[in-house]
């Protein structure tokens, strides 16, 4: 993991055009080359990012210095998507810190009991999302974290399912990021989204439906009661 603190600006081009003016920010570059830009604003969501698979180039301009009042930056980091022409270019005007760390292998997120069981039961009862649905796998890996469940619907199209105990706007945002990323892969697209939870706030439901996601209410006790009891004695 490479962590950079710098006065920087950024430009994202091709699929969409977006820019960040000069300000002090934190850049994370992960081992898979994904690049994320953070600031004090917002919550956990980066201001902008380039997801893997992508390539990273460090460019040191001629006559580079750390004077924010000059036009010559210390460094430019260019992240280029492997499967599209998307480019995220970050201009580092002044670098305060640039450190790399070997974090080793992560054991992954350990979910609380109810949420983990909801995922288990829905995976076993995947036709709850629709007739003819089939499970691909639980904890489907992506560059930005695992999708709770990846499935294929009755039409043969992929479905990413985000599961929460109590579904709020943050969960919809998380599902949005997964679907945005997965739909860039021509082998998976189109990827639809389902937001599944025991309870879903009205605001989260409106946002999910606005983004084209289906909402699915999960009855924990009822799903638990349909477990395979063929080996139970009583």
UniProtKB/Swiss-Prot annotation:
**This protein's record includes keyword Hydrolase:** yes
Q: Name one GO molecular function term.
A: single-stranded DNA endodeoxyribonuclease activity
The record's GO CC annotations read: cytoplasm
Q: Alphabetically list the UniProt keywords.
A: Cytoplasm, DNA-binding, Endonuclease, Hydrolase, Nuclease
Name the top EC class.
Answer: hydrolase
One Pfam match: NucS_C
Q: Does the keyword Nuclease apply?
A: yes
List the subcellular locations: Cytoplasm
Q: What is its main location?
A: cytoplasm
* InterPro entries linked: Endonuclease_NucS (IPR002793), NucS_C (IPR048301), NucS_N (IPR048302), NucS_N_sf (IPR049173), tRNA_endonuc-like_dom_sf (IPR011856)
Identify the EC number(s).
3.1.-.-
HAMAP family xref list: NucS
Q: Which family does it belong to?
A: Belongs to the NucS endonuclease family.
Q: Which NCBIfam families match?
A: PRK03298.1 (NF002876)
**Task performed by this protein:** Cleaves both 3' and 5' ssDNA extremities of branched DNA structures.
Protein name (Swiss-Prot/TrEMBL) = Endonuclease NucS
Please tell me the species this chain comes from.
Answer: Bifidobacterium adolescentis (strain ATCC 15703 / DSM 20083 / NCTC 11814 / E194a)
Tell me the lineage of the source organism.
Answer: Bacteria, Bacillati, Actinomycetota, Actinomycetes, Bifidobacteriales
